[in-house]
């Protein structure tokens, strides 16, 4: 089955705006101990969320390709989530729906793909090795399986270092949205060698 062509969503007119919106500023101030009760409480508050959704700007940059898009991420239950990517003109490029044991992806031509591994499928179909399984935790400001991380002066994640399957990801958080409780990440950047993934969250709805 031919793979979908994502070239046309690269370098569209709003791409420069997306990159500007995704710039990351490292939080200032001394870091806090990962053993602090405030950090444990923050993690518990985030894990207690049953449903959440966020939307914003997405950028993937490597030597091979550059992709800029809008994204919508929604989780409706344990291991049940939806990821939507649209180009800067508003057209849907990719829709991924995941539930336990079944993942479906629909491309811009309406072609449907199924798998039991969302991370592997999105990598093969788009050429973007997005660490989706870990990103589901990182986007919430949780370390997931990572044990090497730092906190900011408000007992929230500021940086993660994580190695898996030959990838060495570094995640830097540029700020948090304090209008939601608990506070949720406002922007973040993932890097692995020459690859960069930037996310800027416009807003969060949490339950």
Swiss-Prot record:
A lipid is attached at residue 22 (N-palmitoyl cysteine). GO terms for cellular component: cell outer membrane. Plays a critical role in the incorporation of lipoproteins in the outer membrane after they are released by the LolA protein. It is found in: Cell outer membrane. Belongs to the LolB family. GO terms for biological process: lipoprotein localization to outer membrane; protein transport. It comes from Escherichia coli O6:K15:H31 (strain 536 / UPEC). Keywords: Cell outer membrane, Chaperone, Lipoprotein, Membrane, Palmitate, Protein transport, Signal, Transport. A lipid is attached at residue 22 (S-diacylglycerol cysteine). Pfam families: LolB (PF03550). Its main location: membrane. SUPFAM superfamilies: Prokaryotic lipoproteins and lipoprotein localization factors. It is a lipid-anchor. Monomer. This is Outer-membrane lipoprotein LolB. Residues 1-21 form the signal peptide. InterPro entries: LolA/LolB/LppX (IPR029046), OM_lipoprot_LolB (IPR004565). The keyword Cytoplasm does not apply.
């Amino acid at each position: 089955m031919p793979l979908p062509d994502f070239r046309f969503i690269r370098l569209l007119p709003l791409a420069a705006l997306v990159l500007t919106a995704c710039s990351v500023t490292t939080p200032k101030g001394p870091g806090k101990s990962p053993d602090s009760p405030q950090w444990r409480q923050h993690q518990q508050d985030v894990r207690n969320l049953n449903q959440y959704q966020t939307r914003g700007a997405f950028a993937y940059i490597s030597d091979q390709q550059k992709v800029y898009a809008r994204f919508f991420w929604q989780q409706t239950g344990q291991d049940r989530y939806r990821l939507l990517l649209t180009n800067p003109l508003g057209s849907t490029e990719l829709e991924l729906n995941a539930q336990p044991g079944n993942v479906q992806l629909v491309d811009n031509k309406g072609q449907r793909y199924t798998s039991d591994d969302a991370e592997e499928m999105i990598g093969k179909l788009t050429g973007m090795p997005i660490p989706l399984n870990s990103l589901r935790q990182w986007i919430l400001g949780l370390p997931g399986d990572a044990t090497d991380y730092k906190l900011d002066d408000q007992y929230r994640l500021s940086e993660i270092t994580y190695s898996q399957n030959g990838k060495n990801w570094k995640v830097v958080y540029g700020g948090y949205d304090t209008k939601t409780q608990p506070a949720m990440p406002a922007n973040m950047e993932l890097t692995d060698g020459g690859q960069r993934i930037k996310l800027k969250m416009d807003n969060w709805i949490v339950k």
